[in-house]
Amino acid sequence: ASDVYKRQPADCVKIAKHHILKNRNIDLIASGINHGSNSSISVLYSGTMSAAIEGAIENTPAIGFSLCDFDPNAYLDHTKEYVKKIVKNALENGIPDSIALNVNIPAISSEKIKGIKLCRQANAIWEETFDKRHDPYGREYYWMVGNFVNHDKGKDNDEWAIKNNYVSIVPCKFDLSSKRGLSFLNDNWKI
């Protein structure tokens, strides 16, 4: 389409699916390549993954791709091999309904990547601090900084995979409900 839409990534998927491509079958939504990791807790803040999840909500196969490099001029050529392989598998073998794949590609040369790992999301957090700064006009703003802390010591998660030079694939779903939390509330709250 010749129209340009400037919206949030999930909104772009909705506009494409229900307006631009409304009479067409969509084989796959590929979102990204994001500059920076969307592994572990970072998936919650990700526009790239929100677009993929939006597709999955409507049972359209969807994948969010991220390169673990925040440099806007990052070298992307080595990602082609993995994007092609993953997309080919998704088209030929499918993705379960309501599931989006979260793919993170290490920022290393193709020769150093050991392969692809299917894994789960790591249990990690950001311990944030905020720097108070001033823009050129003297206005205050805050810049979030902090340390990424991986509490997950398993070898079956995305953080381990990326750290050990693997491309990680985590199947993600929209439902963030906690069965354990719901059970606790049902047993202990008097509402």
List each model region and its residues.
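A charged, well-structured terminal subsegment
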Residues: K84-K112
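Glycine-rich phosphate-binding loop signature in dinucleotide/nucleotide-binding domains
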Residues: I20-I26
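Short, glycine-/small-residue-rich phosphate/pyrophosphate-handling segment
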Residues: I63-A90
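Short, small-residue-biased leader/transition segments that mark boundaries at the very start
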Residues: A1-Y5
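C-terminal accessory domains and tails appended to enzymatic cores
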Residues: P96, P106-I191
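Glycine/threonine-rich flexible loop motifs
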Residues: S37-S46
